[in-house]
Amino acid sequence: MSGRGKTGGKARAKAKTRSSRAGLQFPVGRVHRLLRKGNYAERVGAGAPVYLAAVLEYLTAEILELAGNAARDNKKTRIIPRHLQLAVRNDEELNKLLGGVTIAQGGVLPNIQAVLLPKKTEKAVKAK
């Protein structure tokens, strides 16, 4: 016989994703596939997609945390593009990273030039 159906063999271990091995939520396998299909290089190492997935996950978590804070400040429970815009533009490093990015339906940061603000009079200063 061909040897199929024997009962003495070991059961195959449950498959474990590379994302779970790395402790990530982002899909390492999908990132690897996209790196291979994207013609970025002839070959892609095993560690490259893990590292890239970790970086993407970190940036996403950072933006979502700041956007969640912006939503909470506006007494909202759902993050909308406006909250993403406020989160990115109020953070110096994220603003530099995403400087050339336009967020649809994001609006603009509120900003009034100092010369347009009402002047403080002496009475207002003494009242304090």
Swiss-Prot record:
The modification N6-lactoyllysine is found at K10. Residues 7-19 have a biased composition (Basic residues). There is a cross-link at K14, K16, K120 (Glycyl lysine isopeptide (Lys-Gly) (interchain with G-Cter in ubiquitin)). InterPro entries: Histone-fold, Histone_H2A, Histone_H2A/H2B/H3, Histone_H2A_C, Histone_H2A_CS. Its main location: nucleus. Pfam families: Histone (PF00125), Histone_H2A_C (PF16211). Residues 1-22 are annotated as: Disordered. Monoubiquitination of Lys-120 (H2AK119Ub) gives a specific tag for epigenetic transcriptional repression. Following DNA double-strand breaks (DSBs), it is ubiquitinated through 'Lys-63' linkage of ubiquitin moieties, leading to the recruitment of repair proteins to sites of DNA damage. H2AK119Ub and ionizing radiation-induced 'Lys-63'-linked ubiquitination are distinct events. Phosphorylation on Ser-2 is enhanced during mitosis. Phosphorylation on Ser-2 directly represses transcription. The modification N6-glutaryllysine is found at K96, K119, K120, K126. The modification N6-acetyllysine is found at K6. CDD domains: HFD_H2A. The modification Phosphoserine is found at S2. The modification N6-(2-hydroxyisobutyryl)lysine is found at K6, K10, K37, K75, K76, K96, K119. The modification N5-methylglutamine is found at Q105. The modification N-acetylserine is found at S2. It is found in: Nucleus; Chromosome. Keywords: Acetylation, Antibiotic, Antimicrobial, Chromosome, DNA-binding, Fungicide, Hydroxylation, Isopeptide bond, Methylation, Nucleosome core, Nucleus, Phosphoprotein, Ubl conjugation. Expressed and secreted by skin epithelium. GO terms for molecular function: DNA binding; protein heterodimerization activity; structural constituent of chromatin. The nucleosome is a histone octamer containing two molecules each of H2A, H2B, H3 and H4 assembled in one H3-H4 heterotetramer and two H2A-H2B heterodimers. The octamer wraps approximately 147 bp of DNA. Belongs to the histone H2A family. This is Histone H2A. It comes from Oncorhynchus mykiss (Rainbow trout). The lineage of its organism: Eukaryota, Metazoa, Chordata, Craniata, Vertebrata.
